[in-house]
């Protein structure tokens, strides 16, 4: 597995409005809303490719296909994504992680916004994504 860089970090927000008050209003981070979503994010914070505030309901939908986080699964507090070279490398990395004993939450798939990602829950309770986001690979 060849991880190229940390693609993104997001806090998981059970209460997105309160989290927005902290990260946008109090800290002054330049987070923008995603259309039709409570997800706030920025690609313009120095030292970070992507930082987001991800509503728990949207994280549950992305991982389990339901807005409710399963009661028998540790509720995550954050998500970190590691970028690989291409969509095929996401599948390969997910297979390697599974072979090493780490059960995926879901296999590699393309999200509606064009990112290919496979996710698992870490022993620490983080959502860990192996991803390929085409916009991170475009020539400057």
Please place each PLM-identified region on the residue numbering.
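Core segments of cupin and vicinal oxygen chelate
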Residues: 10-60
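N-terminal beta-strand motif that seeds the catalytic metal site of vicinal oxygen chelate
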Residues: 1-20, 77-82, 133-140
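Vicinal oxygen chelate
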Residues: 2, 42, 94-140
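Short, flexible, mixed-charge acidic loops at enzyme active sites
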Residues: 56-71
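Short hydrophobic/aromatic beta-strand element in the GNAT-like acyltransferase core
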Residues: 40-41, 50, 81, 117-119
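Short connector loops at helix/strand junctions that flank enzyme active sites
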Residues: 4, 46-48, 73-77
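Mid-chain, well-packed structural core segment of small domains
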Residues: 74-94
